[in-house]
Amino acid sequence: MKKIVFVLVLMLSSFGAFGQETVSGQFSDALSTPITAEVYKQACDPPLPPAEVSSDWDCCDVCCNPACAGC
């Protein structure tokens, strides 16, 4: 019984420590959001269509298209 309680406590404590929703007080984390947003913006700017335009170019070559969940 003690082992089960220990495992449950360990799981709950690690969930909070490794979760993505945790807030860090480090200064470097404050800068990560604008940098990430800028990289995302640059990565999602649609390039010029290729010389041979295919019918699915709008979907699979532009990463910000919400219709392209798998691309």
UniProtKB/Swiss-Prot annotation:
<feature type="propeptide">
    <location>
        <begin position="20"/>
        <end position="53"/>
    </location>
</feature>
<keyword id="KW-0964">Secreted</keyword>
<keyword id="KW-0800">Toxin</keyword>
<comment type="function">
    <text>Toxin which activates the particulate form of guanylate cyclase and increases cyclic GMP levels within the host intestinal epithelial cells.</text>
</comment>
<comment type="similarity">
    <text>Belongs to the heat-stable enterotoxin family.</text>
</comment>
<protein>
    <recommendedName>
        <fullName>Heat-stable enterotoxin A</fullName>
    </recommendedName>
</protein>
<dbReference type="InterPro" id="IPR001489">
    <property type="entry name" value="Heat-stable_enterotox_STa"/>
</dbReference>
<dbReference type="GO" id="GO:0005615">
    <property type="term" value="C:extracellular space"/>
</dbReference>
<feature type="disulfide bond">
    <location>
        <begin position="63"/>
        <end position="71"/>
    </location>
</feature>
<feature type="disulfide bond">
    <location>
        <begin position="60"/>
        <end position="68"/>
    </location>
</feature>
<keyword id="KW-0732">Signal</keyword>
<feature type="signal peptide">
    <location>
        <begin position="1"/>
        <end position="19"/>
    </location>
</feature>
<keyword id="KW-0260">Enterotoxin</keyword>
<dbReference type="InterPro" id="IPR019806">
    <property type="entry name" value="Heat-stable_enterotox_CS"/>
</dbReference>
<dbReference type="Pfam" id="PF02048">
    <property type="entry name" value="Enterotoxin_ST"/>
</dbReference>
<keyword id="KW-1015">Disulfide bond</keyword>
<dbReference type="GO" id="GO:0090729">
    <property type="term" value="F:toxin activity"/>
</dbReference>
<feature type="disulfide bond">
    <location>
        <begin position="59"/>
        <end position="64"/>
    </location>
</feature>
<keyword id="KW-0843">Virulence</keyword>
